């Protein structure tokens, strides 16, 4: 370390300079890379993963610098580089981290092609310096002296050999190299031995570079064909057709294909033609199913980087695509294209079965499966099938317990973004969806649809006859409503029924259907209770889950013969009590569904708590009780047969996908 002499001015200013600092920093980066510490990017070449640091890659290569700076606010940590060999890329990475690399004579041409493609000026300059020294050594060689290496001038390509090194030190490839350790590094470090050990572990044998050369990539030449790079005249690369100016004549040649219609790259599977080779490679991923770009948030795989960047906007909620007509913004470009049809008047894709229109063809294709019954996506865990892949991915998150989507208001987590959006509406307090029959308002559209089904089940004959009979007068409608009210007051035991459909019933002794009831989703009058009505031989398959929420700690369970013998599991104080649990289906009654009940049962009040424990029960377990106070009991009916309409005297609710949350399917440990 040296210090420059101070100037005559006062106060004195010292300029401290270290000749070894840059080498020490570079060696430290190399040590961190080999230990896989602080690495923020993984590069995949021929299925070999290379850990690295973005900052050093961007500082060494203009290609990586442009790639990373184009990410804007999206930070991707996994990239796959096509058209390269793992062995050659390992040599390039070694030069970036140590400024020294040892390569075989046969692979130097591949190394220089990759250096030009990645735009690594120091590596290219090191090769040029080595060439100049070799030419000088050939001129000064004495006559009759035996040659140690092949004359470089006899090679077809003078860029056939590279010994990467610092600008101040040059070594010949064929001589035995000394230890390349820099200042501050371990003297026993040998890059050749390190690369050989790494190659035995995970890097494939070097093969000829195919489909990578720049002139191959741009001009459609046969890959692997050696020769000098084409020299274009030193003139401006301007298109004579449209006047556009390009950085090089290579890009100009590609652009001219848009005018000539030339498409030299053809897909061997479907025959589709393309103007550029990389576009063909992206297209071929549709046939192979390859999706190398992985979302770091939800692990969704995509085939192109552009698709990944658009997908990441869904997580960041950045709406970068704005309609020029109305100013509406969208997070994906395809959404904007679909929206533009509203202004252009272009027809939307329409279903031939139900004539429903969709924003794009992809949504229509997904919808058609609802008519054909096709469910091509199967869960490998439980075997359940789905019509859409996105639905399967959400379902798999349920198995894994993953909930990456967080509500910004209450921090509640969800497994899919649509559930979070529906939940966030509840914080606004707005109920924009109203029933046209009874004027009840809902915050969510799916709850309104479920509510409308209850009206359709109440009076289906009236709807069928409405098409044949003329509309009734006002007195006739009032008389019919009075008759319906008299019928609803006839049977109080089945005043309200929440019916579990037969396809949701488990097999005897194999699974349980659990109803999770908390103070957040249930509130009744003081003289009301909850009755669970089951069919024969199904009481052992039904279980109740309650949580300590102040006033919901006891539930009434009723069987058809009046015996309270249903297995009840109560969750109080974090403990689970009951028999050996099997695989369970937990169903949560939504708050909106309870609001529908409250419309017919009055304002919500505190539920009366009744404790009745047997002598054999110990611990904080809620007792099983048959309530005698249920003037208007809310009944949850579990049957294997459809209940006749004459026995349903009140509001009927169907527990289906739209009205309940199908939360989790797992094995429950009684000790947790």
Curated annotation (Swiss-Prot):
Sequence ranges of Polar residues compositional bias: 160-171
Protein name: Zinc finger and BTB domain-containing protein 24
Name of the coding gene: zbtb24
One Pfam family per UniProt: zf-C2H2
Zinc finger (C2H2-type): 237-259, 265-287, 293-315, 321-343, 349-371, 377-399, 405-427, 433-455
Homology family: Belongs to the krueppel C2H2-type zinc-finger protein family.
GO biological process: negative regulation of transcription by RNA polymerase II; regulation of cytokine production; regulation of DNA-templated transcription; regulation of immune system process
Signal peptide as annotated in the record: none
Residue ranges occupied by any BTB domain in the UniProt entry: 39-105
General function of this protein: May be involved in BMP2-induced transcription.
Organism: Danio rerio (Zebrafish)
GO molecular function term, any single one: zinc ion binding
Compositional bias annotation for Low complexity: 476-487
PROSITE patterns xrefs: BTB, ZINC_FINGER_C2H2_1, ZINC_FINGER_C2H2_2
InterPro entries, A to Z: BTB/POZ_dom (IPR000210), SKP1/BTB/POZ_sf (IPR011333), Znf_C2H2_sf (IPR036236), Znf_C2H2_type (IPR013087), ZnFinger_BTB_dom_contain (IPR050457)
Keywords per UniProt: DNA-binding, Metal-binding, Nucleus, Repeat, Transcription, Transcription regulation, Zinc, Zinc-finger
Bias kind Basic and acidic residues: ranges: 148-158
DNA-binding region: 140-152, 223-235
Record localization: Nucleus
Region Disordered, annotated ranges: 136-208, 453-492
Gene Ontology cellular-component terms listed: nucleoplasm
């Amino acid at each position: 370390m040296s210090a420059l002499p101070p100037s005559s001015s006062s106060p004195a200013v010292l300029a401290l300079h270290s000749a070894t600092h840059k080498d020490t920093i570079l060696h430290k980066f190399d040590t961190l890379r080999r230990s896989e510490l602080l690495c923020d990017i993984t590069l995949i070449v021929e299925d070999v993963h290379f850990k690295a640091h973005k900052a050093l890659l961007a500082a060494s290569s203009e290609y990586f610098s442009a790639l990373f700076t184009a990410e804007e606010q999206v930070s991707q940590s996994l990239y796959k580089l096509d058209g390269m060999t793992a062995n050659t890329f390992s040599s390039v990475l070694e030069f970036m981290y140590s400024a020294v690399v040892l390569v075989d004579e046969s692979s130097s041409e591949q190394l220089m092609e990759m250096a030009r493609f990645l735009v690594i000026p120091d590596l290219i300059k090191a090769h040029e310096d080595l060439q100049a020294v070799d030419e000088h050594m050939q001129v000064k060689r004495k006559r009759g002296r035996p040659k140690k290496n092949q004359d470089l001038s006899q090679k077809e390509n003078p860029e056939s050999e590279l010994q990467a090194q610092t600008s101040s030190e040059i070594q010949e490839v064929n001589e035995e190299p000394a230890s390349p350790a820099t200042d501050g590094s371990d003297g026993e470090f040998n890059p050749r031995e390190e690369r050989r050990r790494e190659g035995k572990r995970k890097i494939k044998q070097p093969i000829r570079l195919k489909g990578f050369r720049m002139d191959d990539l741009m001009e459609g030449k046969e890959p692997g064909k050696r020769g000098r790079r084409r020299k274009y005249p030193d003139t401006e690369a301007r298109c004579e057709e449209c006047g556009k100016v390009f950085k090089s004549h290579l890009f100009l040649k590609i652009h001219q294909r848009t005018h000539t219609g030339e498409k030299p790259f053809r897909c061997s599977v479907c025959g589709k033609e393309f103007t550029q080779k990389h576009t063909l490679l992206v297209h071929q991923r549709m046939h192979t199913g390859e999706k190398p770009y992985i979302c770091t948030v939800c692990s969704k795989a995509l085939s192109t980087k552009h698709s990944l960047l658009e997908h990441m906007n869904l997580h960041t909620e950045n709406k970068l695509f704005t309609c020029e007509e109305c100013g509406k913004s969208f997070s994906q470009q395809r959404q904007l294209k679909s929206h533009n049809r509203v202004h252009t008047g272009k027809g939307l894709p329409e279903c031939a079965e139900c004539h429903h229109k969709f924003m794009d063809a992809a949504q229509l294709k997904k919808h058609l499966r609802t008519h054909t019954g096709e469910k091509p996506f199967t869960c490998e865990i439980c075997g359940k099938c789905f019509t859409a892949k996105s639905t399967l991915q959400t379902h798999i998150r349920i198995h894994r317990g993953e909930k990456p989507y967080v509500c910004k208001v209450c921090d509640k987590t969800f497994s899919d973004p649509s559930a979070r959006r529906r939940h966030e509406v509840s914080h606004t307090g707005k109920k924009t969806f109203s029933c046209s029959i009874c004027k009840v308002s809902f915050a969510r559209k799916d709850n309104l649809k479920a509510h409308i089904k209850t009206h359709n089940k109440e009076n289906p004959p009236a709807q069928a006859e409405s098409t044949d009979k003329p509309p009734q007068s006002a007195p006739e409608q009032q008389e019919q409503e009075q008759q319906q009210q008299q019928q609803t007051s006839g049977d109080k035991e089945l005043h309200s029924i929440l019916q579990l459909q037969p396809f949701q019933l488990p097999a005897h002794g194999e699974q349980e259907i659990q109803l999770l009831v908390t103070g957040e989703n249930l509130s009744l009058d003081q003289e009301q209770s909850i009755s669970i009505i089951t069919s024969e031989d199904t009481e052992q398959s039904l279980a109740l889950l309650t949580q300590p929420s102040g006033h919901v700690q006891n539930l009434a369970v009723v069987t058809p013969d009046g015996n309270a013998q249903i297995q009840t599991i109560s969750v109080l104080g974090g403990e689970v009590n009951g028999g050996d649990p099997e695989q369970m289906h937990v169903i949560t009654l939504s708050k909106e569904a309870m609001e529908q009940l409250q419309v017919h049962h009055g304002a919500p009040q505190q539920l009366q708590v009744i404790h009745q424990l047997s002598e054999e029960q110990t611990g904080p377990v809620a007792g099983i009780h048959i309530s005698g106070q249920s003037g208007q009991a809310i009944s949850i009916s579990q049957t294997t047969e459809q209940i006749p309409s004459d026995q349903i005297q009140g509001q009927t609710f169907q527990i289906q996908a739209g009205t309940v949350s199908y939360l989790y399917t797992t094995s429950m440990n009684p000790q947790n």
